[in-house]
Amino acid sequence: MANQSTETNQPSNMQTYGVPIYAADWIPEVDVRSKIIMDPEKSEDDDESSSSSSSSRSCIVLSGGGGEGRSGISNVILICRVDLNTNSLSEQPLGRLVVGSDLPYRMAVHPREGGLICALPNSCKLFHWEDIMSREDNQAGESEEVIKELRDVGQQLALAFNPEGSVLAAGAEDGTLRVFKWPSMNTLLNESQAHSSVKCLTFSESGQFLVSLGGPVCRVWDVNASAAVASLSKEKDEMFASCRFSVDSAGNEVLYIAANTERGGSIITCDTKLWKRKWSKPIKKNSISAFNVSADGKLLAIGTLEGDVLILESTRMQTIQVVKKAHLGLVTALTFSPDSRGLVSVSFDSRARLTMIEQKGDKPGVRWWLLVLLIVLLYVVAYYYMKAKGIIP
């Protein structure tokens, strides 16, 4: 069981940060080490790279708030500490930046040292880690940059960097898909009718392909050719919810699509050579609101409208861990730690929750069945042995 927070009755792996949370991601370790001061009293010389010290430096960034109006709830970007060794989140954010009346609804963290891009109601803005950490008045200022090419473009519902951080994609509520080189912002693609509304974006591990999802269609784009090369359509009553690229155990790229139906959710696995669906795994009685894949490709995470969190093994799609009522409301985002040991989930309930991945092992029921089978086999062998020796007729 997780340790209890010192000031509340909730476990230390679940913290309440005072605002509805819409997005979450892990901050690259190089940024944590160089730009986010974790422990001012600790000497910089004491920088031995061990698994323990690396875990203690882990940080996540969260964004959310009350939006426009007079709700009294601030719109903020938060930096919080995560300790995988003790299964805990910091009670108070390490950094907190108020961004005025604009809700940071979606975000993309640069995979190297490029900071954070947030999608605000009408524009996208670049934030630097040191500004989130060091601003004395906790208010966004002129150092936060509105990205010129994404100014006055309406609400962006999806943002994504390619794995190298050299390409940025933005998907708009009006269905426009924009792809740029980063950081030059030279346009690679500007498709005004990619979808009725772009809901999700994901780059392939190689960076060659970008998948955009919106409504009943999932489109595949060749980034280098700046053109669509395939489309995947829904079947029957499916409604696509999210998508993620990953790599399977054989080193092949695979595309996962999370969908909802009247019977519940499902995870669709797609071949990335023929761009055809291979199979679909129903997730009965669970409507999917958030989806992600671990960095090592071995695990899938699902957040539901009911606030549950499910973790699946990716090869056979077996559910290996369930956290019922992880949140009081629908799960808005999920993000695995870079080493795939932990999962952070967030929600409208203002909470962030850290779930440690249980180590593989035989379940007690399986061990009992193996023991029973062994006893039966020993009995059969003993019976025929004694019969052969004439001990029993």
UniProtKB/Swiss-Prot annotation:
Keywords: Acetylation, Endoplasmic reticulum, ER-Golgi transport, Golgi apparatus, Membrane, Phosphoprotein, Protein transport, Repeat, Signal-anchor, Transmembrane, Transmembrane helix, Transport, WD repeat. The lineage of its organism: Eukaryota, Viridiplantae, Streptophyta, Embryophyta, Tracheophyta. This is SEC12-like protein 2. It is found in: Endoplasmic reticulum membrane; Golgi apparatus, cis-Golgi network membrane. Signal peptide: none annotated. Required for the formation or budding of transport vesicles from the ER. The modification Phosphoserine is found at residue 43. GO terms for biological process: endoplasmic reticulum to Golgi vesicle-mediated transport; protein transport. GO terms for molecular function: guanyl-nucleotide exchange factor activity. In the process of transport, may migrate to the Golgi apparatus and function in subsequent transport events. It comes from Arabidopsis thaliana (Mouse-ear cress).
